[in-house]
Amino acid sequence: MADAAGLTGSAAETLAAKLRRAPLVLAIVVSPKPSPKVPDWEQEVVASGVAHALSLALDEAGWGVMWRTGLQARADAVHRIHQLAPNERLLGWLYVGAKPASKSGRRTPIKAKDYLTAL
């Protein structure tokens, strides 16, 4: 991963430590299949939705979950590490572990009208 990020020395060690923060790291990969009815982009959206649903299910089961992405997710070196086929794309990683003992504060509610529109 450090190679994919172009890091060396202490920066590479810092990245390696971050990758070991969670006891379980799941790679989220889309493997699109040729289909006249379901284009590649839609297959990627479905894979993302499945990963999100998995993160919600893990959270509901009491696990802490964080979806991580970054420039490394699309790097050739990372694709080699994950042994992805030429048509496969890494969408990111789900870091799974224990939840913090307590949440700090309460989230500020958002105003849905600031983010949604109607046709």
What do the predicted segments below correspond to?
Residues 22-24, 61, 90-92:
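Generic beta-strand structural signal
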Residues 26, 32-81:
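Small-aliphatic-rich amphipathic alpha-helix that forms the alpha element of a beta-alpha
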Residues 78-91:
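Short, electropositive alpha-helical surface patch
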Residues 90-119:
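C-terminal helix-cap and adjacent tail motif
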